[in-house]
Amino acid sequence: MNYRNYISVNLVTIAVASYFMGCTREINTDVLATSPNLSEVFMDAFAPDLQFQAWGKPTNMSTDTETRYSGTTSMRIAVPDPTDLAGNWAGGTFYTEAGRNLSGYNALTFYVKSTVPTTLEAGLGSYGDNPQYSVTISGIKVDANWNKVIIPIPNSAKLTAEKGMFFYSAGAVDNSGYTLWIDEVKFEYIGTLAHTRIENMTMAGFPSGDFEISTLIGYVNLPNGIDQKITMSPKYFTFESSNPEIATINENVITFHGGKGKVVFTPKEAQGSITVTDIYDFAPVPTHNEANVISLYSDKYINTLSSPFNGYWDWQTTSNNEINAGGDHIMHYGTFNYVGIVLDNDADCSDMDYLHIDILLMDESDGNQQITVEAHQGGGDAVATVGQKVTTLKTGEWVSVDVPLDANTNLVHELMLQRPDGSNYQDILVDNIYFYKN
């Protein structure tokens, strides 16, 4: 589980001096302007320029002089159990207001151990509401032995004034709390880190607008030969475009310029690429009067219904992600076989005649690819189909599907999109999901 999902609702800013009152070590909040390239975060004591912001339980972090990797003192993290009213997980970020020049280092390293086998999320670059150069490793395995963790920095030349030094996040194991210890947190230059690459990524393009890439998956080869997987900001890289007249990229924003065709973005500082497979038109703008519509997903109407848009039902392989192309929102379904779109609250369709949905097939096809669209009343064992239609899809073109609803339709609980036997495509785009009456 990715515990940072809870940061926005559990973030608690702590006055550092009072927070550590009575602890063995204190963080000095005076900014150390004379050492902008300081490598230490925690080496028996906190670096003098650091401040701390707790996530989850505010009192989860302290220091310990008994259990340590080396020296005299370690950081002690008390991970609470899920029922702790003060906070049901432990996390925090160490930062400096002045920023540090980290361009001479290529890794953040630390040692960690735990009272129980668990996993930890950790990284750097978490500062403020809009981190610029974040790097995260999830699923770090922790046990009763001290183990060194290496968090590679994909392109440290960008970090000339970085403020986010180190963050961690951990949750309960088997509904129980436990203790973590972290020690020797510092930035290093490790000469045997090599072969930085981004995971190849494909996406749809649109005639105009900006598309923001929030994160990339990357890999860096560690001294032990393992390719360490990291989640990182695209801003670490400078990308070149194979067709700049069609699309360009600046930091983490792709801008489309109106042309059509394939575009490949390659980073100068790493291997791998981001490929825009084609430029697609936007879905047709709906023309129904809003008074006759109950909308789930459309930029034309007020969406009074809501859904996570993927029920992750048994045996499905379908993933989903939303594309925001200059304010136009489109849902992408990949590795598609079928997907359930379960409504957060049932839709009263007693006065509605049709379910509408626009679908675009991204795969090349022989012209014989179909999709089944269904509306269901009830769920689980009590599900009943109240509307169904099989439609032939067209590569690169939007197909509008209008599914007649049964005359006795009352509350619609879920929708289902399914690839019938004989069809073999993988990727579709979906827009304008709503119910309407004539």
Language-model regions, residue ranges each:
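Bacterial Sec-dependent N-terminal signal peptides
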Residues: 16-53, 189, 193-198, 279-287
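Short carbohydrate-recognition loop motifs
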Residues: 63-87, 316-340
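Beta-strand acidic-aromatic groove motif in beta-rich domains, primarily in extracellular
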Residues: 86-90, 117-127, 164, 365-376
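Extracellular/lumenal carbohydrate-interaction signature centered on repeated Trp-anchored short motifs
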Residues: 86-108, 141-143, 344-355, 392-395
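Extracellular beta-strand ligand-recognition surfaces/modules
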Residues: 110, 148-188, 357, 370-373, ...
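Extracellular carbohydrate recognition and processing domains
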Residues: 129-161, 378-412
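Solvent-exposed, low-complexity, repeat-rich "mucin-like" stalks and linkers
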Residues: 194-238
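Low-complexity "stalk/linker" and mucin-like segments enriched in Ser/Thr/Pro/Ala/Gly
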Residues: 229-253
